[in-house]
């Protein structure tokens, strides 16, 4: 008998401890769900566009579904080591609370294990089975009616810091099918790959044949009520795991088969030329009139587009195109935020209309960056929240080797939903070939900035932070976090890093607050803080700090904040072509030829022609003329191999070059 036991252990690979614990799994109570038909979907207004079209679904087979979500005790009979995650972030501590911090692979493995153990066929519910079981014959917002009774409510609001609540299962009244906790408690993994609904009547749909995201349903604690609706759709990157998602299971002899082809690519990924562009350096001064790159999609295109379009990134492509991305949302802290894109195709003068670029359904997507590494690869990095807000983001990365026509599946490069992960446009490649990604260190205006470094082309990333709290940001002090948010980072000739940023302003020797400058000589482990010579910027403004192809450093920033800077301190002095000085206001460029020690060249970003423009986002309308440039905006820039500088604000695209910035100005003898 002992030999038989050893043979079983050897063949299955199951340890004795796992075998013993498997015999002690608490009962998973199952409820009979009859076959039937229902109408799936919802009104599809605004961010809920993916709930359309409403369509008839026939569930042709009866099945059993677990009355509640799987608990810690039940899951840990399969994975005892998961017990180490109990109570993380103050949630799901007890045996009878819903298990969380489980990936899609984790829950599929549990179903396979339980199937082997009991000789039955367990799996996840399809999205259609889940909604059918949740509705239980109802068509209200919730199976309880138009609203949620108090028994279901567990801090149902957007929560920057998750409020500890009980996730004990079975505490809500059962619906008409006998299921508890279908609204809230924790989100629940479903079997399907996510994708748009089809309009036709369907039998036993099981989603797309492939996609980047797996469906979740039901909503959770610490999120607004609307995400708990019967018809609300969500999804996650399969490898993601966090405190707001668990699962329940189905027992059925029926095996769903996904038959719907993947979604066609969006417009920004269609008809992309794959011929390498022949770049010719432009030596004459160039300044092109600003034009909008955020253009509303055609009404029948199926692309989402919301009222607030902001926080862009931009890169050049090897085929000569420019690719710009930004977030679109009605609420900056909302779960409906999407990342849109537009392409300025080589040889054309007008940007394409906006189309969807990246969206993990019902997750806040704050923070995007793009980089052409000049080695044939485009990098896209993005933040992804567990739900709403932008404090607890994980970081993901995608790559393209064909000018953005196709992208790799999102790779999670910083898996914890935590601070220091809010991606900022301005990814750089160092002389060592390392990638450096700046990120905000927290959600506030004075939380400083972090960097993440990859030494292997994006496979692995590390934040060199030592875990210490923010230091006092003052001249000469040191710390392990960059002073200011929305930082731009460059590598200096000696290999050190320099950063300029917004907020955490530093007093200079004259007692004036200046834009903070941070310098690190150990690749971001330690930063020394200085007051730069530039005025600080404020809300609705983001700078660009980069090294130009020609060698100098370029800063693009604002002379002041049009509403928050005291009137007497607004504007900066600029030289004109006749050698006289004038006071200008708004967006400017400054150039340094000595690694940031001095900035002898400064120019207001206007050609002097009067224009009435719409800057979008927080900028809105403004007047550009000889002494006024764009007053606010989140800036991002790239420089293509022809040495043209491509700058975007929250809505407008500018194109100019170093020759235009320096035209008519005194250039130091030691310039590049």
Model-identified regions with their sequence ranges:
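Bacterial N-terminal signal peptides that target proteins for export
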Residues: 1-9
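Asp-box/BNR beta-propeller blade signature and adjacent active/binding-site loops
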Residues: 258-672
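Functional-site microenvironments in short loops/helix caps that host divalent-cation chemistry
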Residues: 33, 39, 43-47, 85, ...
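Disulfide-stabilized, aromatic/cysteine-rich ligand-recognition loop
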Residues: 24, 167, 173-175, 208-267
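A short glycine-rich, aromatic-capped structural motif
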Residues: 24-86, 105, 184
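Residues that flank catalytic or metal-binding motifs in active/ligand-binding sites
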Residues: 26-29, 34, 53-55, 59-61, ...
């Amino acid at each position: 008998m002992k030999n038989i036991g050893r043979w079983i252990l050897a063949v299955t690979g199951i340890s004795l401890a796992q075998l013993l614990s498997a015999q002690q799994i608490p009962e998973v109570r199952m409820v009979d769900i009859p076959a039937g038909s229902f109408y799936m979907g919802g009104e599809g207004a605004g961010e809920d566009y993916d709930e359309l079209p409403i369509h008839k679904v026939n569930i042709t087979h009866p099945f059993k579904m677990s009355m509640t979500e799987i608990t810690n005790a039940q899951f840990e009979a399969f994975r005892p080591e998961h017990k180490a995650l109990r109570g993380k972030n103050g949630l799901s501590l007890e045996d009878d609370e819903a298990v969380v911090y489980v990936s899609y692979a984790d829950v599929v493995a549990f179903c396979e294990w339980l199937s082997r153990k009991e000789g039955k066929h367990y799996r996840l519910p399809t999205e259609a089975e889940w909604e059918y079981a949740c509705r239980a014959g109802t068509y209200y917002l919730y199976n309880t009616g138009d609203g949620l009774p108090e028994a279901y409510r567990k801090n149902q609001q957007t929560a920057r810091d998750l409020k500890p609540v009980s996730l004990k299962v079975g505490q809500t009244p059962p619906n008409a099918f006998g299921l508890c906790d279908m609204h809230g408690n924790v989100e629940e993994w479903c079997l399907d790959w996510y994708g748009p609904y089809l309009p036709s009547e369907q039998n036993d749909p099981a989603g797309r044949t492939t996609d980047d995201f797996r469906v979740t349903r039901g909503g959770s604690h610490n999120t607004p009520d609307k995400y708990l609706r019967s018809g609300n759709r969500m999804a996650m990157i399969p490898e993601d795991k966090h405190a707001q998602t668990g699962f329940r299971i189905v027992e059925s002899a029926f095996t769903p088969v996904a038959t719907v082809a993947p979604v066609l690519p969006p417009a920004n990924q269609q008809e992309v030329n794959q011929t390498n562009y022949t770049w010719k350096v432009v030596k004459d001064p160039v300044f092109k009139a600003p034009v909008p790159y955020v253009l509303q999609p055609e009404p029948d295109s199926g692309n989402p587009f919301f009222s607030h379009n902001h926080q862009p990134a931009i890169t050049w492509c090897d085929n000569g195109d420019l690719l710009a991305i930004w977030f679109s949302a009605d609420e900056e802290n909302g779960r409906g935020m999407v990342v849109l894109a537009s392409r300025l195709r080589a040889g054309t003068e007008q940007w394409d209309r906006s189309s969807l670029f990246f969206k993990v359904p019902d997750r806040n997507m704050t923070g995007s960056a793009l980089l052409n590494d000049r080695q044939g690869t485009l990098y896209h990095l993005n933040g992804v929240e567990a739900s709403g807000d932008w404090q607890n983001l994980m970081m993901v990365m995608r790559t393209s080797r064909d000018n953005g026509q196709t992208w790799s599946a999102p790779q999670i490069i910083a898996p914890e939903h935590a601070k220091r992960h809010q991606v900022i446009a301005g990814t750089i490649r160092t002389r060592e070939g390392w990638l450096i990604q700046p990120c905000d260190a927290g959600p506030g205006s004075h939380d400083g900035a972090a960097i993440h470094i990859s030494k292997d082309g994006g496979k692995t990333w590390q934040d060199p932070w030592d875990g210490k709290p923010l230091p006092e940001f003052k001249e000469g002090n040191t710390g392990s976090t960059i002073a200011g948010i929305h930082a731009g980072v460059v590598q200096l000739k000696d290999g050190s890093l320099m950063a300029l940023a917004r907020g955490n302003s530093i007093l200079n020797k004259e007692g004036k607050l200046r834009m903070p400058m941070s310098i690190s000589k150990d690749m971001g482990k330690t930063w020394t803080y200085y007051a730069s010579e530039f005025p600080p910027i404020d809300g609705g403004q983001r700078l660009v700090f980069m090294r130009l192809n020609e060698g100098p450093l370029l800063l693009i920033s604002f002379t002041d904040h049009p509403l928050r800077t005291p009137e007497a301190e607004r504007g900066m002095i600029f030289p004109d072509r006749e050698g006289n000085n004038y006071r200008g206001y708004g967006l400017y460029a400054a150039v340094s030829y000595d690694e940031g020690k001095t900035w002898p060249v400064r120019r207001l970003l206007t050609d002097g022609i009067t224009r009435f423009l719409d800057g979008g986002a927080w900028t809105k309308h403004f007047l550009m003329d000889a002494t006024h440039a764009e007053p606010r905006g989140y800036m991002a820039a790239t420089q293509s191999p022809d040495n043209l500088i491509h700058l975007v604000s929250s809505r407008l695209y500018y194109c100019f070059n170093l020759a235009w910035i320096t035209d008519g100005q005194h250039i130091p003898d030691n310039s590049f």
